[in-house]
UniProtKB/Swiss-Prot annotation:
Cofactor note: Binds 2 heme b groups non-covalently.
Additional record remark: Heme 1 (or BL or b562) is low-potential and absorbs at about 562 nm, and heme 2 (or BH or b566) is high-potential and absorbs at about 566 nm.
GO process terms (BP): mitochondrial electron transport, ubiquinol to cytochrome c
Residue intervals passing through the bilayer: 1-7, 31-52, 67-79
Similarity remark: Belongs to the cytochrome b family.
GO CC field: mitochondrial inner membrane
Quaternary structure and partners: The cytochrome bc1 complex contains 11 subunits: 3 respiratory subunits (MT-CYB, CYC1 and UQCRFS1), 2 core proteins (UQCRC1 and UQCRC2) and 6 low-molecular weight proteins (UQCRH/QCR6, UQCRB/QCR7, UQCRQ/QCR8, UQCR10/QCR9, UQCR11/QCR10 and a cleavage product of UQCRFS1). This cytochrome bc1 complex then forms a dimer.
Protein name: Cytochrome b
Keywords: Electron transport, Heme, Iron, Membrane, Metal-binding, Mitochondrion, Mitochondrion inner membrane, Respiratory chain, Transmembrane, Transmembrane helix, Transport, Ubiquinone
Keyword Heme carried by entry: yes
Keyword Iron: yes
Chain's role: Component of the ubiquinol-cytochrome c reductase complex (complex III or cytochrome b-c1 complex) that is part of the mitochondrial respiratory chain. The b-c1 complex mediates electron transfer from ubiquinol to cytochrome c. Contributes to the generation of a proton gradient across the mitochondrial membrane that is then used for ATP synthesis.
Cofactor section: heme b
């Protein structure tokens, strides 16, 4: 969905809302693509948080190097 949305992306901040409105109104199934993208991203981060919770449960934070790499990856995902 990100590739389909990127085709209609506008980097100008004054046209950002117009870009979203164009995608939803003028692109065939644009509203569906936008909703799938938003819900898919939310599900992705829920899975990430569950994975972190599993690490807490099994004590993976005791392995400092692995845990620090995981923290760096999480921060990279959020950036």
């Amino acid at each position: 969905t990100a590739l389909l949305l990127a085709m209609h992306y506008t980097a100008d901040t004054s046209l950002a809302f117009t870009s979203v409105a164009h995608t939803c109104r003028n692109v065939q199934f644009g509203w569906l693509i936008r909703n799938l993208h938003a819900n898919g991203a939310s599900m992705f981060f829920i899975c990430i948080y569950l994975h972190i919770g599993r690490g807490f449960y099994y004590g993976s934070y005791l392995n400092k190097e692995t845990w620090n790499i995981g923290v760096i990856l999480l921060l990279t995902l959020m950036a």
